[in-house]
């Protein structure tokens, strides 16, 4: 008969030996944007690409568009793991916004734009939990689509608010608890 009977959970802590370093799965950023000079092999259009460090493929983004600036900013602050979806820069702003919002290609069935983040788990083997689209998320159509994707992925949207007045920033609400402006 044991001398001591334990009620509940017993925790055994092992303080020696080698333990793997793991990335917190809630910190994976899903980033959608443009990079016209990007290497098409490293960053194919409308395809989730996993980036784990500054040296891993980032040089292939080029210097123009929204993705190079966004990735530099992220790596300057923390260096988080990212799933990047590069979209085509349109002839005008409206076309580019349409490309960011994306959808499904009727001919191939491939998801495009923000919709491509839904394929991140099968393609990049990670699940983005923080969704951003720098320079586009202040557009209500983009922010609304981001919230829709976030609900599906159980993620959070970090959206840019309007940069006009305090009243406009307060009234800019996507009406969902999964968004941060």
Where are these regions (language model features)?
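Surface-exposed assembly/interface segments
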Residues: 1-181
């Amino acid at each position: 008969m044991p001398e001591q009977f334990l009620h509940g959970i017993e925790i055994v802590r092992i303080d020696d030996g080698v333990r793997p370093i793991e990335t917190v799965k809630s910190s994976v950023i899903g980033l959608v944007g443009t990079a016209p000079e990007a290497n098409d092999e490293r960053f194919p259009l409308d395809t989730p690409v996993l980036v784990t460090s500054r040296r891993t493929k980032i040089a292939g983004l080029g210097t123009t568009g929204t993705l190079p600036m966004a990735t530099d900013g992220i790596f300057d602050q923390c260096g988080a793991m990212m799933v990047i979806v590069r979209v085509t820069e349109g002839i005008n702003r409206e076309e580019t916004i349409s490309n960011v919002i994306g959808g499904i290609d009727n001919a191939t069935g491939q998801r495009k734009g923000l919709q491509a983040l839904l394929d991140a788990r099968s393609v990049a083997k990670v699940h983005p939990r923080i969704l951003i689209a720098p320079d586009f998320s202040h557009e209500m159509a983009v922010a609304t689509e981001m919230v829709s994707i976030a609900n599906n992925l159980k993620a959070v949207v970090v959206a840019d608010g309007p940069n006009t007045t305090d009243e406009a920033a307060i009234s800019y609400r996507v009406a969902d608890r999964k968004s941060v402006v």
